[in-house]
């Protein structure tokens, strides 16, 4: 199935330039991934599924004008969100050199002027405040909330791409004002920033 069809089946519609950019991303990830071990799953279908996984929450989260993705790795979800939402100021926070080199190469190849890549650990980032903080498969929810405390604004929302241990993490984190949306094996935890 084509990427366009896969996304459209999930109520995600984008202009042609997005799909062209994704073709470049797929090609670059497949080339770099084999050499630098960026991702274990490099078939077109696997990458398309990861792109869908990255974008699916756009169906249910609130609008945002900036976001920071913690531990972007090979580009999921942050780089994909930056490609899809060029109107949004995007920050990818990734400490590993090889992954940062790949992310910078994709940024340059696609001319992503909305994107800033920070080679740091999240807890060491200062002087940045965003509307939305995302993370996929980095660590537990409680630790994510703690290590991102310096980059959140008063009303920052969180979007964490989680697996099966989510109920325990929610209880441990003592969060409120959240919703969980499930798709296949994925649980998306959306913690809405509070407005008083």
Where do the model's predicted regions map?
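Residue-level preference for alpha-helix termini and adjacent loops
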Residues: 13, 37-41, 75, 124, ...
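Class I SAM-dependent transferase core
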Residues: 1-64, 68, 98-115
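Conserved beta-strand/loop positions that form the S-adenosyl-L-methionine
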Residues: 70-72
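Conserved active-site region of classical short-chain dehydrogenase/reductase
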Residues: 55, 79, 142
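S-adenosylmethionine
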Residues: 88-91, 95-196
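Conserved SAM-binding loop of SAM-dependent methyltransferases across substrates and taxa
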Residues: 74-87
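N-terminal cationic-hydrophobic initiation segments that often serve targeting/anchoring roles
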Residues: 58-59, 82, 149
